[in-house]
Amino acid sequence: MNILVVKTPEELAEVGYKLIEEVVKTKENPTLGMATGSSPLGIYAEMRKNKLDTSRVTTVNLDEYVNLPHEDKNSYHYFMQEQLFDHLPFKQTYVPNGMASDLEEECKRYEGILAANPVDLQILGIGENGHIGFNEPGTPFNSPTNIVELTESTRQANLRFFEKEEDVPTHAITMGIGSIMKAKQVLLVAMGAKKAEAVKELLQGEYSEECPATVLQRHPNVTVIADQEALSLCSEAIADEHRQVFTISDLLSDSRVGETAN
């Protein structure tokens, strides 16, 4: 597991973009696993700013709310259109359909899409309780795409995007932890003190379904980009022989960003 230490959201965005750019430029027909929320916003802005050639790129999104129309500004369909799909010409884009009449069938359909489009790089944020995607504590590590009931803590964390609490959806479709782990490479981004406990569990905690992010301890190719606040509860042991810690000056001055993905 590689840990890339940054000071600002702008640095996180630039380093994250370079990792994505490397995949897009070196793979013939790359597939990117996309996340939503505030964590990847800067990275998506860099993709727009740099006019990344996405004409060969297929995207698959992690999740979508259930019963939230695609045109709703808080749906992840809307989010992706606003952030990327209306700005860059992708080969193909997929987002789970939370409006499907048969949600179980939609989960199976989406698993088929993932099987046909193996993910080269999966972007992840991390929840304060360690969730990845909408996979809450207690989710089996081998879970496929599934329907989940959102915990109260997750709904409260997402309340800032909605006008009132009752507008926050109670359920979502999410790629399962087993689905996420099939990605060839994972890029997890974390900023701020609110993520510190979850990041500590990810890097130093016990491998346990009680903290979904700890599954990444067993993934062969994970890069974590985090600031000092997000790393504030971690011991210096994170710089042991299993992990590499770089600073922004290391990363942007040479080719080491690409090397962390190998």
Swiss-Prot record:
Molecular function terms, GO-annotated: glucosamine-6-phosphate deaminase activity; identical protein binding
CDD domains hit by this protein: GlcN6P_deaminase (cd01399)
Pfam families hit by this protein: Glucosamine_iso
Keywords on record: Carbohydrate metabolism, Hydrolase
Pathway participation: Amino-sugar metabolism; N-acetylneuraminate degradation; D-fructose 6-phosphate from N-acetylneuraminate: step 5/5
Family affiliation: Belongs to the glucosamine/galactosamine-6-phosphate isomerase family. NagB subfamily.
Lineage: Bacteria, Bacillati, Bacillota, Bacilli, Bacillales
Entry EC number(s): 3.5.99.6
Species this chain originates from: Bacillus cereus (strain G9842)
Coiled coil: none
Protein's UniProt name: Glucosamine-6-phosphate deaminase
Active-site residue numbers: D63 (proton acceptor), N129 (for ring-opening step), H131 (proton acceptor), E136 (for ring-opening step)
